[in-house]
Amino acid sequence: MPESKALLKSLTDVNGISGHEMQVKSLMKDYLTPVSDEIVEDRLGGIFGKKNATHGTKSLMISGHLDEIGFIVTQIDEQGYIYFTPIGGWWNQVMLSQKVTITTENGKEIRGIIGSKPTHALSPEERKKPVDIKNMYIDIGVGSKEEAKEAGIELGNMITPYSEFESLANDKYLTAKAFDNRYGCALAVDVLQQLKDENIDINLYAGATVQEEVGLRGAKVAANLIKPDLAIAVDVGVAYDVPGMTSEKNEGKLGDGPLAILMDATSIAHDGLRKHIKDVAEHHNIPVQWATTPGGGTDAGSIHVANEGIPTITIGVPLRYMHSNVSVLNIDDYTNSVRLITEIVRSLNDDSYQALMW
């Protein structure tokens, strides 16, 4: 899907941590408007394209999230080094010597490098321990606090990982920052594009929430606004096909199809919806990897308990090296997740909704 690769590139290239999703939302609005009957926005920044049902009264929410993990500027020292606090879940060991982008108030992007005390200056005991985030700083190549401020740096500036979108040796393997969760953003656009000239029998809301990485916050707001009868959170899942993890689980392998999450730390998939999706996948010969994730969660955690309760499941793709500066997905998994969710939409109507409820 060349068009999908271009879509993924444009969405991962743009920067937007939790609470600073404005650029991503603006781009999503450009993509959603031509393929939607209506644009629905909440006051926190969530955005969805709506496609009206030709027949039928029920509604389905397909929800990615706009935000990516990153950092916020908390201090500038006298030498112009910048200190920061994480936004979203980070592991200290993946941060050192990585390039980042600091976005100033006027939108200027300044490149920097996360640094700390060099290895030559570490004691034997220090070398055995991960570097604490409080001992890391960002070097933007200035010599003083005044010079950093003149460049536009101030407290509260957004900091995002810097990583270019590229294909690897096998061009089905793509690497970029922010596949978590610009994958879900791209999928929402592609599903609406697939259905643009079709009649459907369920009101479809496809788009993305805000502030997922800091506690599934925007999903609660969006679900309360849309009030869907069913929901699918679209997000990435852990890939277990790398050294050190392969023996743990026989799931989450790149190239083996989308992931359907049976349970995680914040939600349990609605069983009637699970069975319906399983039937759809088998009927259309779409590969699915059924997975459990004891830790972590997705927007499903907030959506399924909104209003009077919303039958919800998470569908995504396995992703290597998530919550770091760079990650890897397989475009076939993306394509099959678009196929799967498009067929789910086509399969739903008032009768099939009643059949999956219990």
Please place each PLM-identified region on the residue numbering:
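N-terminal hydrophobic/helix-forming segments and targeting peptides
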Residues: M1-W358
